[in-house]
UniProtKB/Swiss-Prot annotation:
One GO-annotated biological process of the protein: positive regulation of tumor necrosis factor production
Tissue occurrence: Widely expressed, with high expression in heart and spleen.
Protein name as annotated: FERM domain-containing protein 8
Species, as recorded: Homo sapiens (Human)
GO cellular component: centriolar satellite; cytosol; nucleoplasm; plasma membrane
A Pfam family that the UniProt record links to this protein: KRIT1_FRMD8_FERM_C
Modified residues (N-acetylmethionine): M1
Function in brief: Promotes the cell surface stability of iRhom1/RHBDF1 and iRhom2/RHBDF2 and prevents their degradation via the endolysosomal pathway. By acting on iRhoms, involved in ADAM17-mediated shedding of TNF, amphiregulin/AREG, HBEGF and TGFA from the cell surface. Negatively regulates Wnt signaling, possibly by antagonizing the recruitment of AXIN1 to LRP6.
Amino acid sequence: MDGTEGSAGQPGPAERSHRSSVSSVGARAADVLVYLADDTVVPLAVENLPSLSAHELHRAVREVLQLPDIALDVFALWLVSPLLEVQLKPKHQPYKLGRQWPELLLRFTSAPDDDVAMDEPFLQFRRNVFFPKRRELQIHDEEVLRLLYEEAKGNVLAARYPCDVEDCEALGALVCRVQLGPYQPGRPAACDLREKLDSFLPAHLCKRGQSLFAALRGRGARAGPGEQGLLNAYRQVQEVSSDGGCEAALGTHYRAYLLKCHELPFYGCAFFHGEVDKPAQGFLHRGGRKPVSVAISLEGVHVIDSREKHVLLGLRFQELSWDHTSPEEEEPILWLEFDGDSEGTPVNKLLKIYSKQAELMSSLIEYCIELSQAAEPAGPQDSATGSPSDPSSSLAPVQRPKLRRQGSVVSSRIQHLSTIDYVEDGKGIRRVKPKRTTSFFSRQLSLGQGSYTVVQPGDSLEQG
């Protein structure tokens, strides 16, 4: 499993995948099915499947879809099931990994034996975790943009990417534009929206959408705040005149959708399953645990509440130290250390994430940091490689403001976490943020001046 990146959830038996990526195997030839993010199937006839590498299958998919060379970097092959998701390295052999799937599930998930026996992975062609967002802004091929759009849309609708209502409305409006065309008051397509509202908004926002349809049909009914926001956003989607006609216009809307998703800190992340301790609610009442998703990208780590669909903690790599432990007969733990305060006193905080994927998460953090450091000197040069004559290049702003709404689902909620707070025993706290005076772990992002210094802490840790 060296170098693979994955994520896992714990669905019920009803959610089992019935897909398979090998439809038939002969003496030499095999029919392989590769799925796209929109559930489209790419059938491939290949020979010598057991020894075929992910790189060779990737090339075959690109040829069938007639994708440009940039797709080699943008997309990767994944082995996916409801229990585990693994991005494959080019050298990996998907067929052999598929045969080893039960062993991977036992090692990296807590799924019951019956679920492990029934689970079957399928091959999916989707975004490469290691592809930088800044390079994504330079893509102008419409089919590549469409594939990225479909994947991002699926993550938004499934609430894998938690979004504020305002962002759901803006993104849903762009989906309306792509699927229904330019907004026209009273057009017959409004009835299509009634039947396909979950194609535009996450499920938890669709429950209160009944008044939207009458408003779209012009019957005078007042839509609720969320529904009215979607309707207003649909009206305001800008149309861009282009010599390329309809296809060029769709490419503009795909790009606009991706640009909006880039504002979400967990766009393009790999997702992992874990649990964290809840804060104790009383002297004799233990808090228990809550399930979380851990989203890791080239930029940092986000811990997301799996049930409430909001961010609990968001850290850039410059803001954390980390390690993982796998004690015998105990659960593996990913440790995240970051600066905080306790009743106004600066402290170091330790967060424990219980997960059988702690090893995968730790390895991915380390590799993402290595890639970021290696790419940093080339940043300004890469940003200048876009074609200045391309009018769509002006749609990519150099820098976008971060979301800072009060109560935003992407804002950290550290108060909902149970952490261990500590300072160096026997010494006063002397530091100027963000520089750390004490570090429990030695694994950090080193950026030279201004990076954290490693000082051994005292022996005793104080429970926060």
